[in-house]
């Protein structure tokens, strides 16, 4: 515990091993079989328990939970472990759970990784180096992730899947199979199915104008001619419909993104 900076409200169990220059913030809880290597920093409210090792220069943000038992019914309190390498950034509410008897008794994370808010790494996962998991990525058990892989926010990966090196998974993607190295995987994006007619009715919009606006967007997104011409034609045709005019104004504004594709 040489030169370590430990807040007075932190709870560190007897037996925990701390390296040099470890910083432990307010209300952190450290179990008796935890090893924190040199220059590890726990911001506050971090819970690390079980047989867990955190590599040097790793920074863990508030409310992260590392080394808790796996979420499986057949877990029988076996002495499994969680090993996290060096130079990792583990943001708020990340959970990394210990291994199980059916997966080698260890969950392992490599070096130089970024795990954004709310990431879940399930039991027996093996994560490589230099990966990026965006917000709320969820990995089930027994998943292997290769070096330099990127997983977009709110994506979920099925148990036992393999994510190859240098691959990328787009946001909101349910991944139920292996992803090859260098592969690009993405789920179907949200599509425009019509107008929020029920919500518009509840807010007092005129029903006739709302239905007319629905017809107008069908003409804009699936009519003949190019998109700009269709917008102009619809603006002229429905110039007395305030709902359509509001939509047209939105379509004519500058944007760095495309519009959601229309599917009736």
From Swiss-Prot:
<protein>
    <recommendedName>
        <fullName>Acyl-[acyl-carrier-protein]--UDP-N-acetylglucosamine O-acyltransferase</fullName>
        <ecNumber>2.3.1.129</ecNumber>
    </recommendedName>
</protein>
<dbReference type="Pfam" id="PF13720">
    <property type="entry name" value="Acetyltransf_11"/>
</dbReference>
<dbReference type="InterPro" id="IPR018357">
    <property type="entry name" value="Hexapep_transf_CS"/>
</dbReference>
<dbReference type="Pfam" id="PF00132">
    <property type="entry name" value="Hexapep"/>
</dbReference>
<keyword id="KW-0012">Acyltransferase</keyword>
<dbReference type="GO" id="GO:0009245">
    <property type="term" value="P:lipid A biosynthetic process"/>
</dbReference>
<dbReference type="GO" id="GO:0016020">
    <property type="term" value="C:membrane"/>
</dbReference>
<dbReference type="InterPro" id="IPR010137">
    <property type="entry name" value="Lipid_A_LpxA"/>
</dbReference>
<comment type="function">
    <text>Involved in the biosynthesis of lipid A, a phosphorylated glycolipid that anchors the lipopolysaccharide to the outer membrane of the cell.</text>
</comment>
<comment type="pathway">
    <text>Glycolipid biosynthesis; lipid IV(A) biosynthesis; lipid IV(A) from (3R)-3-hydroxytetradecanoyl-[acyl-carrier-protein] and UDP-N-acetyl-alpha-D-glucosamine: step 1/6.</text>
</comment>
<dbReference type="InterPro" id="IPR037157">
    <property type="entry name" value="Acetyltransf_C_sf"/>
</dbReference>
<keyword id="KW-0441">Lipid A biosynthesis</keyword>
<dbReference type="InterPro" id="IPR011004">
    <property type="entry name" value="Trimer_LpxA-like_sf"/>
</dbReference>
<keyword id="KW-0808">Transferase</keyword>
<comment type="subunit">
    <text>Homotrimer.</text>
</comment>
<keyword id="KW-0677">Repeat</keyword>
<keyword id="KW-0443">Lipid metabolism</keyword>
<dbReference type="InterPro" id="IPR001451">
    <property type="entry name" value="Hexapep"/>
</dbReference>
<keyword id="KW-0444">Lipid biosynthesis</keyword>
<comment type="similarity">
    <text>Belongs to the transferase hexapeptide repeat family. LpxA subfamily.</text>
</comment>
<dbReference type="InterPro" id="IPR029098">
    <property type="entry name" value="Acetyltransf_C"/>
</dbReference>
<dbReference type="GO" id="GO:0008780">
    <property type="term" value="F:acyl-[acyl-carrier-protein]-UDP-N-acetylglucosamine O-acyltransferase activity"/>
</dbReference>
<keyword id="KW-0963">Cytoplasm</keyword>
<dbReference type="GO" id="GO:0005737">
    <property type="term" value="C:cytoplasm"/>
</dbReference>
